[in-house]
Amino acid sequence: MKKLILTMAVSALMSTSALAANIGVSMAQFDDNFLTVLRNGMQDYAKTLDGVTLQVEDAQNDVAKQQSQIQNFIASKVDAIIVNPVDTDATAAMSKLATAAGIPLVYVNREPVNVNELPAKQAFVASNEVESGTLETKEVCKLLKGKGKIVVMMGELSNQAARQRTKDIHDVIATDECKGLTIVEEQTANWSRTQGADLMTNWLSAGLEFDAVISNNDEMAIGAIQALKAAGRKMDSVVIAGVDATQDALAAMAAGDLDVTVFQNAAGQGKGSVDAALKLAKGEKVEAKVYIPFELVTPDNLSKYQSKN
């Protein structure tokens, strides 16, 4: 069923006929495993299309730099713009710039703050973040049999995904079947493996006791694993969960270190954003929100995902 939904979501955008187009792409940062897969998905797909050129820029996690890139795309009269926002609270200004220039704009992966008021010729392609943290936390609850102490590693709080995934965690542990779970610590590690390791080291040094780590992404979860191992903690004594199902995360799961992740189809989002941009450039209609489903990954179904992302 999930495969069918995914096929429908992407195929709905794939009716674009051949179109010579120059698309400007501003990525929040290149130095991110998941966003690298997403970016590669865009570029690999564009190579299969006649006359389609992507001009891909690295915003280096700098909001001002990203806005400048968008202004440069507009000045060079690109046919469409794709943005993976550095700060999802800064997207209203980006939408205004694109609208004033009459250039289609597609946000990808990170939900813009103005997602419910996107102007004409603008769209958002991603996965529904209500699913991500919910799938992740429900599986942790199941593994802990509804009782235990958990720590939460949050992504960058300027990103809607970090805020929503964290809300998902709280919503799940408020349900009857999971109300025996208690959050004993919750801090940001900014999506970073290094910061995840540092945060976990600090918690361990403080003598914090917990049964599970619920991370907003795989990178921070892997950092937590590294710190736990360095401290001599046995990995079968703690449940570790992340989101994205990156190759590094799947390798950690195969090694018995990561217990839960959630597959986010980065390449599918990248492809979908290019299709949406091309359709909008042709003057065709695109749904304002195009969602590609998340999928729970555990050791039981790991083999299905090892060739993805």
Residue ranges of predicted features:
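A residue-level marker of the well-folded mature domains of exported/periplasmic proteins
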Residues: 3-4, 13, 20-309
